[in-house]
A protein has these predicted regions:
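Amphipathic, heptad-repeat alpha-helical coiled-coil/stalk segments that mediate oligomerization
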Residues: 1-170
């Protein structure tokens, strides 16, 4: 899918092969594999999965094009529901401390999709979708720019550790 292809390209462009794994089985009692796992110090893994429900996102853009506020609101609610289900699934399948971090990342492959997700507020609770997903399911949504920044900061941290280790050995 577009999401998987985009995530693959981003991770492979920003991290050396030693810092990530692909199609990783997180739990022994399942056949489910997370698309990527970023290796942290101590071989702790950050699960990274992608999600792009194209039809639900297209319904939002169609609503905007038709200047139909009700259609946009309905489509945004359906998109939020799809990401809530994805976050729940990712939590259940891939977050398994101490093998992994106590959170996972779900990658939204376009900035426009990421914008919709970060701006969506539950009409009844007024809670932002991104906050709800983190609180309930320990899932962080990242778009291309935020994931790039996260991966670059991890890579710089790993480089600093290498330099520090080298200096200690001298």
């Amino acid at each position: 899918t577009l999401a998987e292809f985009s995530l693959d390209a981003l991770i492979k462009d920003l991290l050396p092969a030693s810092q990530f794994m692909t199609n990783v089985k997180m739990k022994e009692d399942t056949s489910e594999n997370v698309e990527f796992a970023i290796r942290l110090q101590g071989d702790v893994l950050v699960p990274v999965d992608s999600h792009f429900p194209v039809e639900k996102f297209k319904a939002i853009t169609d609503g905007y094009d038709a200047d139909d506020k009700r259609a946009v609101a309905d489509a945004r609610a359906k998109l939020a529901t799809a990401f809530k289900a994805k976050a729940k699934s990712v939590n259940e399948k891939y977050i398994v401390p101490p093998k992994t971090t106590d959170f996972a990342i779900v990658y939204a492959p376009t900035e426009s999709l990421y914008k919709e997700l970060t701006e969506y507020q539950d009409p009844s609770t007024k809670e932002l979708l991104t906050q709800e997903l983190m609180k309930k399911h320990k899932v962080v949504i990242c778009g291309p720019n935020t994931l790039s920044a996260y991966l670059q900061s991890l890579h710089m941290g790993f480089q600093s550790l290498k330099v520090q280790k080298g200096a200690t050995e001298i």
